[in-house]
């Protein structure tokens, strides 16, 4: 099995890259985010690899990090999610945002993925909510905020600040993570305007 490839970029396809490793060209399928982050033809690249062996083909999937590869594997444990859909999800949400979306049970963020309907998105955030933290870095403040939002016990300024950031065009996971951090910095009793200001500062980092 191939676990990692290191070589030079030969060329790109719609959803794959040809990686030249000592004269052998490997066709590696990647998420759109990974493809965008790779260098131009001739540049050096290292990809973590997931190898799929079928009766009629061998297919390689490449990732910028082991964490992205683990998400790829985990997503496919959900009913209705195959390799193509898993890559599409990772094209829409990087690992950190996906972890926060699941922690916040934000199915709308996952459903923005092409080919993922509301039912599949709900299965992803429901079935993976207890699995993702095993290897993903999820801010404890986000997890705590998730519980408060679920129980409708989050302070009004917090919910208003999240809504304000979402209205500014930020995704729910990013907005919630930023306000969770802002709330932790500002302490109890922080007003909406202060949380928004701190949240925007957090998002600009």
From Swiss-Prot:
Region described as Domain III: spans on this chain: 153-205
UniProt KW Phosphoprotein keyword: no
UniProt remark on domains: Has three domains with a flexible linker between the domains II and III and assumes an 'L' shape. Domain III is highly mobile and contacts RuvB.
Protein name, as recorded: Holliday junction branch migration complex subunit RuvA
GO CC terms in record: cytoplasm; Holliday junction helicase complex; Holliday junction resolvase complex
Gene Ontology MF, one: four-way junction helicase activity
Record function comment: The RuvA-RuvB-RuvC complex processes Holliday junction (HJ) DNA during genetic recombination and DNA repair, while the RuvA-RuvB complex plays an important role in the rescue of blocked DNA replication forks via replication fork reversal (RFR). RuvA specifically binds to HJ cruciform DNA, conferring on it an open structure. The RuvB hexamer acts as an ATP-dependent pump, pulling dsDNA into and through the RuvAB complex. HJ branch migration allows RuvC to scan DNA until it finds its consensus sequence, where it cleaves and resolves the cruciform DNA.
Main location group: cytoplasm
Swiss-Prot/TrEMBL GO biological process terms: DNA recombination; DNA repair
Location of region: Domain II: 65-143
InterPro entries recorded: DNA_helicase_Holl-junc_RuvA_I, Hlx-hairpin-Hlx_DNA-bd_motif, NA-bd_OB-fold, RuvA, RuvA_2-like, RuvA_C, RuvA_C_sf
Start and end residues of each stretch annotated as Flexible linker: 144-153
Subcellular location: Cytoplasm
Chain residue ranges for the region called Domain I: 1-64
Subunit structure: Homotetramer. Forms an RuvA(8)-RuvB(12)-Holliday junction (HJ) complex. HJ DNA is sandwiched between 2 RuvA tetramers; dsDNA enters through RuvA and exits via RuvB. An RuvB hexamer assembles on each DNA strand where it exits the tetramer. Each RuvB hexamer is contacted by two RuvA subunits (via domain III) on 2 adjacent RuvB subunits; this complex drives branch migration. In the full resolvosome a probable DNA-RuvA(4)-RuvB(12)-RuvC(2) complex forms which resolves the HJ.
Family to which the UniProt record says this protein belongs: Belongs to the RuvA family.
Keywords noted in UniProt: Cytoplasm, DNA damage, DNA recombination, DNA repair, DNA-binding
Highest taxon listed in the record's lineage: Bacteria
